[in-house]
Amino acid sequence: MNAVNEMAVPFVFTDNAAGKVKELIEEEGNPGLKLRVFVTGGGCSGFQYGFTFDEEVNEDDTTMEKNGVTLLIDPMSYQYLVGAEIDYTEGLEGSQFVIRNPNATSTCGCGSSFSA
C-alpha cells in the first residue's frame, strides 16, 4: 500500500467529494468502507471512470485520507489520474462526482469517458 501525504499528493480529493462520500458511508452503516476510484477501458473515447465502495485495501493500492474518508486507487488507474481533481458538484443538472483530469486529451459529449 502506498500512502500519499497531502503535501506530495499527485491528485486532489476535494472537501466536497470527501464530505459526500462520508455521508454515503454513514448511510450504508459500514464505517469500514473506502472509496475506490478506477479507470477502465470503454466508453466512446476509450477510457471511463468508475467509483465503488470497497472494504479491502490491496497491497499495491495508493491510498489517501481526507476528512476521515479513505480513497483507493489501483496502480493501473493511478497513471491516468495523476494531476486529476476528484470533486462532487451540485447544480441545476443534478449532483454528481466529477473528475477533472489534465491527462484527458479529449472527452465524449456525455462526459463519462475520455482518451489519454
Curated annotation (Swiss-Prot):
Signal among keywords: no
Free-text remark on how the cofactor is bound: Binds 1 iron-sulfur cluster per subunit.
A matching Pfam family: Fe-S_biosyn
Record-level Gene Ontology MF annotations: 2 iron, 2 sulfur cluster binding; 4 iron, 4 sulfur cluster binding; iron ion binding
Ligand binding (iron-sulfur cluster): C44, C108, C110
InterPro entries recorded: FeS_biogenesis, FeS_cluster_insertion, FeS_cluster_insertion_CS, FeS_cluster_insertion_RrpA, HesB-like_dom_sf
Cofactor: iron-sulfur cluster
Keywords linked to the UniProt accession: Iron, Iron-sulfur, Metal-binding
Gene Ontology BP term (one): iron-sulfur cluster assembly
Lineage: superkingdom: Bacteria
UniProt subunit comment: Homodimer.
Protein purpose: Required for insertion of 4Fe-4S clusters.
Protein family: Belongs to the HesB/IscA family.
HAMAP family assigned to the protein according to its UniProt record, in alphabetical order: Fe_S_insert_ErpA
PANTHER family according to UniProt: IRON-SULFUR CLUSTER ASSEMBLY 2 HOMOLOG, MITOCHONDRIAL
Protein name: Putative iron-sulfur cluster insertion protein ErpA
Species of the source: Dechloromonas aromatica (strain RCB)
UniProt gene name: erpA
